[in-house]
Design a protein with these regions (language model features):
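C-terminal transmembrane helical hairpin of 12-TM major facilitator-type secondary transporters
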Residues: 297-344
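Extracytoplasmic
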Residues: 9-43, 114, 245-250
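Cytoplasmic helix-loop-helix junction between adjacent transmembrane helices
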Residues: 103-143
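Helix-breaking motifs and short loop linkers at transmembrane-helix boundaries and internal kinks
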Residues: 40, 72, 93-99, 110, ...
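A late C-terminal transmembrane helix in Major Facilitator Superfamily
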Residues: 352-387
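Helix-loop-helix hairpin linking two adjacent transmembrane segments in secondary transporters
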Residues: 138-191
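Extracytoplasmic gate region of multi-pass secondary transporters
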Residues: 28-29, 224-282, 341-345, 376
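Conserved MFS/SLC helix-loop-helix module at the cytosolic interface between two early adjacent transmembrane helices
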Residues: 59-98
Length: 431
């Protein structure tokens, strides 16, 4: 008898969760030009505004991971989404640059547990053989949210105003919260989940992992693992490039390529639309090709490193004159920037030996990504102000991609969440 697949509805809701989060992020990027005009902002000030939600996002990341480990992803998801949706709506009602920064900080507080929620939910709801595909499918919500959000937000701005674009997109999040609260709990408690599927999930999600004899090693134990730092650095290099394009691509197309608001939204959509399919296909192939032994050995790091090498395509952008050529290179870089983080998230699950540390490990991974990511809009703003072009900004992102590939290959191996053996218990070498 074939096992049902109702768990996919959880992944679909998380896909929408991700899409909504990224529509709310790209809204500021598309609206950047009219906001800068209304408040008289320089490229440097605009860079700080683009980055501002990440300040709170990064600061609240580790506390968010602890909340997930304590209360569960399903509970934290609804509270976090309500907070960030309220902040998104408030952004459309501000009267000054200072109050806009405060609203963006509220968005960061709400979105801080967003990625650990997704990663933790996948680990709770999927067999290990589906882990990479599930995370890639959920992560595809980010690229699809950007692909659809950019032109829709551009249309809302041209049709109504930049203020209404924030109010409308923020309201969508509250609809998602109502659906999530009505349908989702844990696999053990969700009533609409067939018993056969429940047993499959519970029996196979920790396949190959010895049942832990402890509650976890906590943040202190995780940061002692070289693998955690390899994941941290590679995720940072991936997310830096992702935020460069998320924050500045519409503005780049409007100012450097002289496209209209609506056309900049349409061209921004192209790389992220392609990235939607690329992320699912590449990570799905990884799941198919990796054996259980390869998963436990951390072989998924090769997919992470390959993604980073493709992401370095951005180094060639300054040497290409045609708009079509630039969009093609950006599409390669953005697609790679969506394949890599999903693979890295699955790799954390592969290497983790203590389920009690799942929320903290995923939070630390995302902290690495966004520690680098919050710098991307600011660094780019200074570069554009100093040079009058985006060329050096693309070069910085390409160089970081190469650094990340080395970190993934050299460090992201071994295990996470194991207590070291006491010195007296270790076997002695023969004399």
């Amino acid at each position: 008898m074939k096992t049902p697949h109702r768990r996919y509805w959880v992944f679909f809701l998380l896909f929408l969760f991700t899409a909504i989060a990224y529509v709310d992020r790209v809204n500021m990027s598309v609206a950047g030009k009219p906001i800068a005009h209304e408040f008289g902002l320089s490229p440097i000030a605009l860079g700080y505004l683009f980055s501002s939600f990440l300040w709170a996002y990064v600061l609240m990341m580790l506390p968010g991971g602890r909340l997930i480990d304590r209360w569960g992803s399903h509970v934290v998801a609804s509270v976090a989404t309500a907070i960030w949706s309220a902040a998104q709506m408030a952004t459309g009602m501000v009267g000054s640059f200072a109050t806009m920064l405060m609203a963006r900080l509220g968005l960061g507080i709400g979105e801080a547990p967003f990625a650990p929620i997704s990663y933790g939910s996948v680990r709770a709801w999927s067999p290990y053989t589906e882990r990479g595909t599930a995370i890639a499918a959920i992560s595809a919500g980010s690229s699809l949210g950007l692909a659809l959000g950019a032109p829709v937000v551009a249309w809302l701005i041209e049709t109504l105003s930049w203020r209404w674009s924030f109010i409308i997109t923020g309201a969508v999040g509250f609809v998602w919260v109502l659906v999530w609260l009505a349908l989702i709990s844990t696999p053990e408690k969700t009533r609409w989940l067939p018993q056969a599927e429940r047993e499959l999930i519970l029996a196979s999600r920790d396949a190959g992992v010895e049942p832990p004899s402890h509650d976890g090693v906590g943040y202190r134990g995780l940061i002692r693992c070289p693998a955690m730092w390899g994941l941290f650095i590679s995720q940072g290099c991936l997310v830096y490039t992702g935020y460069l394009y998320l924050s500045w691509l519409p503005n780049y197309l409007q100012t450097a390529r002289h496209l209209s608001m609506l056309n900049s939204g349409i061209y921004t959509a192209i790389p992220f639309l392609v990235a939607t399919a690329t992320g699912i296909v590449a990570n799905g192939a990884g799941d198919k090709l990796l054996t259980a032994e390869a998963v436990r050995a951390g072989k998924r790091r090769y997919l992470v490193a390959l993604s980073l090498l493709f992401m370095a395509a951005g180094l060639a952008i300054p040497f290409v004159q045609s708009l079509a050529g630039v969009i093609a290179l950006i599409t390669i870089a953005v697609s790679a920037a969506h394949v890599g983080p999903a693979a890295n998230g699955a790799l954390v699950g592969d290497l983790l030996r203590s389920p009690g540390d799942a929320g903290r490990a995923f939070a630390f991974l995302v902290l690495g990504g966004n520690t680098f990511g919050l710098l991307a809009p600011i660094v780019t703003g200074y570069v554009v102000a100093a040079t009058g072009s985006f060329n050096s900004a693309f070069a910085v992102a390409g160089a970081l991609a190469l650094v990340g590939a080395v970190a993934a290959l050299a460090l992201a191996r071994g295990t996470l969440g194991e207590h070291p053996q006491p010195a007296l218990a270790r076997p002695r070498l023969a004399d």
